[in-house]
Swiss-Prot record:
<keyword id="KW-0694">RNA-binding</keyword>
<dbReference type="GO" id="GO:0019843">
    <property type="term" value="F:rRNA binding"/>
</dbReference>
<dbReference type="InterPro" id="IPR012677">
    <property type="entry name" value="Nucleotide-bd_a/b_plait_sf"/>
</dbReference>
<comment type="similarity">
    <text>Belongs to the universal ribosomal protein uL23 family.</text>
</comment>
<dbReference type="GO" id="GO:0003735">
    <property type="term" value="F:structural constituent of ribosome"/>
</dbReference>
<dbReference type="Pfam" id="PF00276">
    <property type="entry name" value="Ribosomal_L23"/>
</dbReference>
<comment type="function">
    <text>One of the early assembly proteins it binds 23S rRNA. One of the proteins that surrounds the polypeptide exit tunnel on the outside of the ribosome. Forms the main docking site for trigger factor binding to the ribosome.</text>
</comment>
<keyword id="KW-0689">Ribosomal protein</keyword>
<dbReference type="GO" id="GO:1990904">
    <property type="term" value="C:ribonucleoprotein complex"/>
</dbReference>
<dbReference type="GO" id="GO:0005840">
    <property type="term" value="C:ribosome"/>
</dbReference>
<dbReference type="InterPro" id="IPR013025">
    <property type="entry name" value="Ribosomal_uL23-like"/>
</dbReference>
<dbReference type="GO" id="GO:0006412">
    <property type="term" value="P:translation"/>
</dbReference>
<dbReference type="InterPro" id="IPR012678">
    <property type="entry name" value="Ribosomal_uL23/eL15/eS24_sf"/>
</dbReference>
<protein>
    <recommendedName>
        <fullName>Large ribosomal subunit protein uL23</fullName>
    </recommendedName>
</protein>
<comment type="subunit">
    <text>Part of the 50S ribosomal subunit. Contacts protein L29, and trigger factor when it is bound to the ribosome.</text>
</comment>
<keyword id="KW-0687">Ribonucleoprotein</keyword>
<keyword id="KW-0699">rRNA-binding</keyword>
């Protein structure tokens, strides 16, 4: 798998945004991705130094459409801790530039 296939999208929530102050970034990753693959992909794409990777599997939530019941897709979240001397990842575009 290539690096762009492993990292699918950043997770932007209140908790993940607060964790960015401590250089912890949350990404949705491929269901088959390992911690080592996620670490190498983040280092390659964003040119940063990763210290630690935590991964969790998130079950799909039950959703109803009338009397029919279905589930949202399951996903895999990776929380990536960058080193103290590493640059920050710019997830949001700067309006000043």
């Amino acid at each position: 798998m290539e690096a762009r296939d492993i990292i699918l999208r950043p997770v932007i929530t209140e908790a993940s945004t607060a964790a960015m102050d401590n250089k912890r970034y949350t990404f949705d990753v491929d269901l088959r991705a390992t911690k080592t693959q996620v670490k190498n992909a983040v280092e390659e794409i964003f040119d940063v130094k990763v210290v630690k990777v935590n991964i969790m599997n998130v079950k799909g939530k039950q959703k109803r459409q009338g009397r029919y019941v279905g589930y949202t897709k399951r996903r895999r979240k990776a929380i990536v801790q960058l080193s103290a001397d590493s640059n920050e990842i710019k997830l949001f575009g700067d309006d000043n530039e």
